[in-house]
């Protein structure tokens, strides 16, 4: 009794460290044995000598030996011990010896398999201990009734019945059946439609191998139609590996893929915010990113729309709001202000695009005044972006999506009268290179949307700070390649007109190539 009191006292001391920790620990306690004493399930041996003794009786293990190293009796060891005892006794057969009552069904199982599930193992051990007590009481009664007579041969051991209640609506009978099937087979086919239910079943069953299998499948099946549910599942089960995979995938595909489909509506706002803040975010230009975000807001406010709206429809919708203040300062838009603060509006330099920003009455006037003032000062100083310092968070950003059918692909851009060509080249099936080059305005085809509404700089050199990066998905993992942050003067004559070349070797396709740069003062 002194030993039990001292052990109990030590638990009270640990649990009293802080109020929050105490509350959390109480929620995790469970009852063990006939004495209804509390124990902590996360510990292998918690000082409960009676429970340890009961386990030793079931496993036919010497109590004195178990006390020398009680942790060896953790559940992960039970399967091996039970299997050895069954094989030695010669009672192993193919007949099910465990009945699981769950979801209105009775599932026939075998105890060697259920030890892959922490939940089923605990239920089984609890039921087994209770059966041992009941059998012992029956044997004592028989011995008292026939002290000197012969005792009839005992009937075969009854099947052990365990029951479990599941309240998670994600767990369907089909999904639960697939989870139990995985106890017996390593390769059980799952689909995108039922993987969430199997994941929920694996979580409840504490079936780690199956849970990880579901996570791996979900990471490899990310698509516009699945990204929402897979991300929410990762948050629900605190599976950082899955949530990070969703964030990385969406950072690459928000603009080029999801932003072109009605599934954009389903993207949760917290996920969208993380992606907009990500330095890995891919976009063709800042205006492309703005259009994607405007469409997301439009779809949130027009839930009945089932077709992807054209850009003019979205602009007309926001322009229809009262002109007394901008959309982001009115009730519907105030909650989305943090999303638009992630945009780099200074990266929108086209006169035509700036006119769009002004006329849709979406942004606060102070934002537009600041953007316009920065553009004016940059043009006045020959392109110097004195208001931009950090390349990773403030740079102008442009992108190329290099697809499988391309051998070469390029786009031309104009900033403050300077013209550049960003280009990707495929040298062989696994070798690519990406670079940027300054070009003359006379090299552009006229009329050209690049030079339309654009000024022309006659300066022979332009100091540029830039970085080129490329990302692609290979076997479920993102490969990333990048240059350092490079400071270089770009002229019109080779080799001074061309940037450093990013050369990569990969089997991944498509390749998301991003170009970020600013014009330092010169």
Curated annotation (Swiss-Prot):
The record ties this protein, via Pfam families, to: BTB_BTBDG (PF23998), BTBD16_C (PF21059)
The source's superkingdom equals Eukaryota
- BTB domain boundaries: 166-222
From the Swiss-Prot or TrEMBL record, give the protein name.
BTB/POZ domain-containing protein 16
Q: Which organism is it from?
A: Mus musculus (Mouse)
Designated gene of the protein: Btbd16
